């Protein structure tokens, strides 16, 4: 997995969306990141690890290529604005769900 800066991540994410426009999917995950690079041991003493500030880890993949970035709490507003604009621009292939009318279901069958 490639760890990128925020701007590079958005550029690569745009490329992933363009590549998967006709067929394929892009999977995006977002989770809290505390800066650990090693897993927490199940048993034993836990070292006093204190994260310096809150961070978010974003990952994106198309099944073959994986990219990720870490966004700190200081730059989250700037990143969120650019990220939301990117999603609005590239999620135009979504289909609306067919809503079934309630009037047809409420009539008793005779």
From Swiss-Prot:
Component of the signal recognition particle (SRP) complex, a ribonucleoprotein complex that mediates the cotranslational targeting of secretory and membrane proteins to the endoplasmic reticulum (ER). SRP9 together with SRP14 and the Alu portion of the SRP RNA, constitutes the elongation arrest domain of SRP. The complex of SRP9 and SRP14 is required for SRP RNA binding. GO terms for cellular component: cytosol; signal recognition particle, endoplasmic reticulum targeting. Pfam families: SRP14. Belongs to the SRP14 family. It comes from the Eukaryota. The modification Phosphoserine is found at residue 45. Residues 96-110 have a biased composition (Basic residues). This is Signal recognition particle 14 kDa protein. It is found in: Cytoplasm. InterPro entries: Signal_recog_particle_SRP14, Signal_recog_particle_SRP9/14. The keyword Phosphoprotein applies. PANTHER family: SIGNAL RECOGNITION PARTICLE 14 KD PROTEIN. Signal peptide: none annotated. Heterodimer with SRP9; binds RNA as heterodimer. Component of a signal recognition particle complex that consists of a 7SL RNA molecule of 300 nucleotides and six protein subunits: SRP72, SRP68, SRP54, SRP19, SRP14 and SRP9. The keyword NADP does not apply. Gene3D superfamilies: Signal recognition particle alu RNA binding heterodimer, srp9/1. One of its GO terms (biological process) is protein targeting to ER. GO terms for molecular function: 7S RNA binding; endoplasmic reticulum signal peptide binding. Residues 90-110 are annotated as: Disordered. Keywords: Cytoplasm, Phosphoprotein, Ribonucleoprotein, RNA-binding, Signal recognition particle. Its main location: cytoplasm.
